[in-house]
Regions:
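Catalytic active-site module of serine/aspartate enzymes centered on a nucleophile-bearing elbow/loop
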Residues: 154-187
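Accessory cap/linker subdomain of secreted extracellular hydrolases
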Residues: 47-85
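Conserved alpha/beta-hydrolase "acid-adjacent" motif
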Residues: 112, 137-143
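Hydrophobic, aromatic-rich cap/lid helix
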Residues: 73, 92-113
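Active-site nucleophile elbow and catalytic-triad environment of alpha/beta-hydrolase enzymes
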Residues: 5, 9, 103-120
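Short beta-strand/loop motif that positions the catalytic acidic residue
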Residues: 123-124, 130-132, 136
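Active-site-adjacent alpha-helix of alpha/beta-hydrolase-fold enzymes
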Residues: 68, 141-154
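A catalytic-pocket lid/entrance helix-loop region that shapes and gates access to the active site
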Residues: 1-48
Length: 187
């Protein structure tokens, strides 16, 4: 899915009031490492997670990383996929994923506000294909529509029976079709 890296996009996933409203049960698991932290008072999940993920306490680091990865893995597909979460439950994978993502998010993805949208004119003449799941809870489809509106040479494929994960059958099918289409154009 398309992720624009704006504060509201990060907040949708990692702060209360966005995806947490759809997955309240998984959200409770995501919040567990934050009990007795600044996040309880401030509501700043990402900043508090960043402190835990970079802290000296190894047990807290891994607990936070696993909760972060479990949250993301749990909301990535339209229908639950038990084996999708296998990688997410590995402590080292979870720590790498959580630290990288969290580092970007506390630094506003190293973007100026709306930087991607403001610069779409630079690539709007280039062909492209966006494949986005209709029920993507990590990157809501609104972001794909915003990019598509500014990218004249781009096709937008909204997959009706998919969430965020590239392993979902509809996403896989559309990615293969897009790859074949470009292979034919470039041949």
């Amino acid at each position: 899915g398309v992720f624009l890296g704006r504060q509201k996009d990060v907040d949708w996933i990692y702060e209360a009031g966005g995806a947490s409203r759809m997955f309240a049960d998984y959200w409770q698991v995501f919040q567990k490492p934050l009990i007795n932290t600044d996040a309880e008072a401030t509501g700043e999940m990402v900043n508090t997670y960043h402190k835990l993920l970079c802290g000296a306490d190894e047990l807290k680091r891994f607990a936070a990383a696993k909760a972060w990865a479990a949250w993301e893995g749990s909301i990535a597909t339209l229908n639950p996929r038990p084996h999708l979460g296998d990688d997410f439950s590995d402590g080292h994978f979870a720590l790498a994923l959580a630290r990288i993502e969290c580092h970007y998010f506390v630094n506003q993805c190293f973007f100026e506000p709306n930087q991607l949208l403001k610069n779409m004119h630079k690539i709007s003449h280039l062909p492209g294909i966006i494949v986005h799941g209709r029920y993507d809870m990590i990157c809501p489809a609104e972001q794909a529509f915003e990019v598509h509106a500014l990218w004249q040479a781009c096709q937008l494929h909204i997959v009706r029976d998919a969430g965020h994960a590239q392993q979902e059958p509809g996403i896989v099918d559309n990615l293969i079709k897009a790859t074949r289409e470009f292979a034919i154009k470039l041949a």
